[in-house]
């Protein structure tokens, strides 16, 4: 089958070059365009974008209202709700450090009824005579604000207090009923104990379980267990009703020779009777003690056996089905459920009972479990049962019957306290075969009875327990559901407050707004977004880490598992994960298997279950119809693998195929196949799908590869991989890092900060308006990496909706570019690549190949103190002028200044209390009138390990406080930006409308003022064109319409500008006591250096051991030195062969590019044909081949020019090129098919003994930078109690000389060194001072004293009342204080 190009080639300067791909499957691109759909859809369902559809918010309001006061005198009703617009845009919220939120307002109606009389217990209402309804005293309706709701950004994140956060989706056990067993672990006998659990969405859990004696118990909320008969009686069932419910009855009729019983085939399967089987005519059919098989039983039935005889004595030991009472004397003969004894048989004869009903309990297929449980507490009444349940859950209270009944009903049968949710009801119905409406989200009596029945059947050996790790039993809770739950909690609190307020307020003066406190809801939402385990600081290292974080699934969090309790089963890969959850991408630590990632094509349905897409197969022919299946549905079908071979009619070539069915692989005929996978890569996540040749790697290394891609730092110049997978452009577009065109149109203007597009409809007929895109320049991400967007388009380009028009960080031509393509050699070099170490060429460092920019934020807060306000100023006490050279007149560092450790970023002084001056100083002050310094330096200094360039400064001045010059300058720059935007918009609008006006006027072909109208228009200003009056009414009407639209758009541009200015002039709300906040952003350049961690995409990670001069690096025959040397021993044991195949394919890619470059360098008419022919060979079997043949010469040259650096390849997951295809490409590039070349030693110029594998590999620089880790201390802070140096880089601490290090010195016998380490170099306070003195004096002698830690230990022992003292010269040295 021919391979295809990953994207149709469009000759745009801003589109990426299509990749040479060997994929056979068809991608469903629609599913891939929106990678954060899971977040967006969930949130939209909660807020209700479409108010007609029931949303989460609307349902909550409707369930809470109406609220009436305790006596029913007034009622508060919900009318409608509305969601406002955010006050500030996303960037402004990050900048100001505030939450990106929208106001929620509800319309409430307050009705007060007319009342005649109000007593303690009831209210008498005035009734309207006409309607017979309660009379209304008055109605008040008002719109009320109930608080702000954090809203989702366009990228699927939330901005909380200026920080971007992500709400991670949670996998949890679905509401419903689950049947399980203890797997024989509870009792030493290994007997299986079966249990059932009904889990609601909200409310009490109900468990049923057997014990070792096969008595059935129940528990509520894991409290003490009680016999299940108590629960059944509390549901209102009597003993006989319980038996009727759980057991079948068999009718026994008396005759002369015994009891006549109906013959039922199923009851005789494998039975051995102790008596002869005799029909009612007395014929012996089967002798006693003969085993009756199912086949024999069926033969007897077919021979006409309807009834048979049971001897009188043989009913002994059976159980009577209902109470037996003598009709004549009303004497109770037997109670329901009693076992029949010989005495009972005699009574049956005595009282002449001709008909009895027996419970169908045979101890084989039907056990007496319910019956035995019933006889534990046979005589307990309905009231006693309620009391027993109440006593377990609310011990120590003595309730009334009504209280107990209300309490029991509230546990499972009232919507306010118990909610199964729609999902729970569907699962219950499905599991138990019920047909109860989905609207009934509480338990019913039928539910409980059917659960007990199914559990008893399990104990009897029928059916199977549930697999709790099956994705049909686990659902995903996404962001909308979490916020809905928090919203409900907030609204319930609000409801209680409203009811409290209603009991004390005067209704005559009350308005709806008086009842609502907006802070209640805001507090609950703030707590969730700030502190919930699932509200996480967004991983913003690079675009991939953003996407992956939003698509993450966690089993941890509230209502989920904990790391400590989670076993192997829940962490393991399950067959139902196929196409739903990635089996590769998961953390390596203690969270392994608990945190996973959604597969590429998977989606989450409205009930929270994960669906995977499949193409429908009809009678062996694969159709283009794509259907999404749930895990539960999938087990019923035969599903073929995407790699199955199809002919040109999409029919399976093979007669028999391997298919997945019910968790197993089976071989079936092609006509039996129901579905086929849409793509081989549908089983993996976004990160894993970016690894080329994934199928050639060990799964452990693939896991590391997908995790380390998320740690890659965006580099100074992005470089898309030569060997990709075809997913790079999709991830880039879905990440939110690039700028996508909102609407189709023509690019009007481009600069470093703005892209202005004149938008049209799809047919380019109707003008829609102006789209202005603000590019993000040198902004700081959550992980201090640099966000910088660069335009790809140029004026005049036509762009379509969702085209990439600007690259972001780690994006190259709209493709994800996390690392660099470098020339690699797999060999050892002087032992410097021992144990995965990496050797790098100095040329790589010199050319800034792996240089990255990191932006650090520093904040200076100016407060109002008790002694007066702090001040930002340039004149700082005791600081010389040279140290202030990079500050402006205000005292704030200039943008563009180069700063290093210890430099002042913001000069600030703080008032200090006046000190008591000595008399001579007072005299000088009196004589000269000089004011002594009454302030102290509290400036913001650059920390010790930072050096870089100031790229931005933000100054926030409290509203009402006078702004400084720097603040005014920054504000003016912002206003200039707004003016620029407004003018751009007006320019585009004017250009379009004046063109349209000119077209209308010129098309009239008339003269105006005795000259041609086109010439006349040139002679007057454009503004005057509107004043031209023509005689044609239709033309005047057209001009009038154009003028109206023109004025409207210009007015709109001005109003948007005015709004922005108003927001800017509004000022900043800062915390209490804060006058001003200055934020300084410093860009730090990190060059590659030894100690930095690097990795490929195949889990091949290592640390740079040495940067070797370029002239010493091994080089190729043409003199090209290699960039990087990797250890070839790192491949076989790790089994990540993908890196070698990538190297070969990269080698072919670059050399094909060089070959194309050589042809281009000598281009003429003959060589153009040669070029076309060569490209035809390169793209052989590709769709692009036909485009190349039909391209014009100019287009062909432009296309070939972009292939100079290498022909981009795609090796999609499970569809990478095979070894013969790689060999063909190497041959085409005139290379050895082994992929190995002769290398020469750069130091001595000799050829190495054997050929070396050389090629191009894509390497990433990870965010484990040596600059952030290496640390040294000479002098620094000490701990207060122990007086030992602090530990850790963040505290500028020292290295701990620990227990084992002391042993090492002991082993060497270095006694004096050891003594120094434990005393003067650590916590001997006196000794430290003395050694400092002796160093100053030049003396080399010192004495060691007692370490402070020893004194601490002595004090602690004394606190335990143990008197510890030092012994010296046979005397005890007590602490003087103690002796005194």
Curated annotation (Swiss-Prot):
EC supergroup of this enzyme: transferase
InterPro entries xrefs: DNA-dir_RNA_pol_bsu_ext_1_sf (IPR042107), DNA-dir_RNA_pol_bsu_external_1 (IPR019462), DNA-dir_RNA_pol_su2 (IPR015712), DNA-dir_RNAP_su2_dom (IPR007120), DNA-dir_RNAP_su2_hyb_sf (IPR037033), RNA_pol_bsu_bac (IPR010243), RNA_pol_bsu_CS (IPR007121), RNA_pol_bsu_protrusion (IPR007644)
A Pfam cross-reference name: RNA_pol_Rpb2_7
GO cellular component assignments: DNA-directed RNA polymerase complex
PROSITE patterns for the chain: RNA_POL_BETA
Reaction(s) the record says it catalyses: RNA(n) + a ribonucleoside 5'-triphosphate = RNA(n+1) + diphosphate
Record's keyword terms, sorted: DNA-directed RNA polymerase, Nucleotidyltransferase, Transcription, Transferase
EC number: 2.7.7.6
GO biological process: DNA-templated transcription
GO MF term list: DNA binding; DNA-directed RNA polymerase activity; ribonucleoside binding
Family: Belongs to the RNA polymerase beta chain family.
UniProt function note: DNA-dependent RNA polymerase catalyzes the transcription of DNA into RNA using the four ribonucleoside triphosphates as substrates.
Subunit details: The RNAP catalytic core consists of 2 alpha, 1 beta, 1 beta' and 1 omega subunit. When a sigma factor is associated with the core the holoenzyme is formed, which can initiate transcription.
Protein name: DNA-directed RNA polymerase subunit beta
Chain's gene name: rpoB
